[in-house]
């Protein structure tokens, strides 16, 4: 019993000493809160900031804080696509564009139907002029040029060849063809010209030979009405001649109009 009471009395004594600690007996040393508050800066700073604030110069050169990228949500619009709408009205036609390059030639089409016959045309006027004459007598050169005359007519349409002068006179402006055939004389030259008006155009020539031969010459000439064409034997500066006889015709002169031209 004594022991119990003694312990109780001891507990009361310890309580008296501990109460000042519990209720905060004032002391001269600062409390924990006062100590922390005294060390805090006047301005609010983050724990990672440096102790000294940046000077204005340092502020200009300071690296800006990292900017977080903007995050935009992606929406799959295809899942929101609706049904196809009706066709809208046509717009105003634009200006015509530039002409393009010519395309390639297409394939040939099918043959069309036969057309109707046209009205009859006016009758065309056809002009003719032709002659062919021959000589059955031989001829020798003389002191002057000799006009070759003919004694046989094969063709002479409209009498354009004058048998008296041995000349063909052109009735129309156009292109004409002429040909001359002769038989040379043994041991003599054959020297003959086809002459247009008074100008020798072409020559028919054969050298002297012990054998006689046939020679020919031809030419085309443009003529106007009144022009004349004839055959001339060269004068006696050379021993010259052409052969023929009464049995056969060795010498012929022919010509005809190829194409008439408008006057």
UniProtKB/Swiss-Prot annotation:
Q: Which residues are glycosylated?
A: 76
InterPro entries assigned: C1q_dom, Collagen, Collagen/C1q_domain, Tumour_necrosis_fac-like_dom
| Paired cysteines (S-S) | none
Where mainly located? secreted
| Domain C1q, chain residue ranges per copy | 124-263
The family database entries (SUPFAM superfamilies) matched by this protein are listed as: TNF-like
**Every Collagen-like domain range:** 82-123
Record key words, sorted: Collagen, Glycoprotein, Secreted, Signal
Q: Can you supply one Gene Ontology CC term for this chain's record?
A: extracellular space
Protein name, entry field: Complement C1q tumor necrosis factor-related protein 6
User: Where found in the cell?
Assistant: Secreted
Task: Please give the residue ranges the record annotates as the region Disordered.
Answer: 80-123
Which molecular function GO terms apply here?
identical protein binding
Which residues are the signal sequence here?
1-24
Name a Pfam family for this protein.
Answer: Collagen
């Amino acid at each position: 019993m004594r022991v119990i009471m003694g312990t109780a009395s001891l507990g009361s004594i310890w309580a008296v000493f501990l109460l000042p600690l519990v209720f905060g007996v004032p002391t001269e040393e600062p409390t924990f809160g006062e100590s922390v508050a005294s060390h805090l800066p006047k301005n609010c700073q983050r724990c990672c900031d440096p102790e000294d604030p940046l000077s204005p110069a340092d502020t200009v050169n300071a690296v800006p804080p990292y900017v977080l990228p903007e995050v935009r949500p992606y929406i799959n619009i295809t899942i929101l696509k609706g049904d196809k709408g009706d066709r809208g009205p046509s717009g105003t036609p634009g200006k015509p564009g530039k002409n393009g390059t010519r395309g390639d030639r297409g394939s040939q089409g099918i043959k069309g139907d036969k057309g109707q016959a046209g009205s009859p045309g006016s009758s065309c006027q056809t002009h003719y002029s032709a002659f062919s004459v021959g000589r059955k007598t031989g001829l020798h050169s003389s002191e002057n040029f000799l006009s070759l005359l003919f004694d046989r007519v094969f063709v002479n349409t409209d009498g354009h060849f004058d048998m008296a002068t041995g000349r063909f006179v052109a009735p129309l402006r156009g292109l004409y063809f002429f040909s001359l055939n002769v038989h040379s004389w043994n041991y003599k030259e054959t020297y003959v010209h086809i002459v247009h008006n008074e100008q020798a155009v072409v020559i028919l020539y054969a050298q002297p030979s012990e054998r006689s031969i046939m020679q020919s010459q031809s030419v085309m000439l443009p003529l106007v009405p009144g022009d004349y064409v004839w055959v001339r034997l060269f004068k006696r500066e050379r021993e010259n001649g052409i052969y023929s006889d009464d049995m056969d015709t060795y010498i012929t002169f022919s010509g005809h109009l190829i194409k008439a031209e408008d006057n």
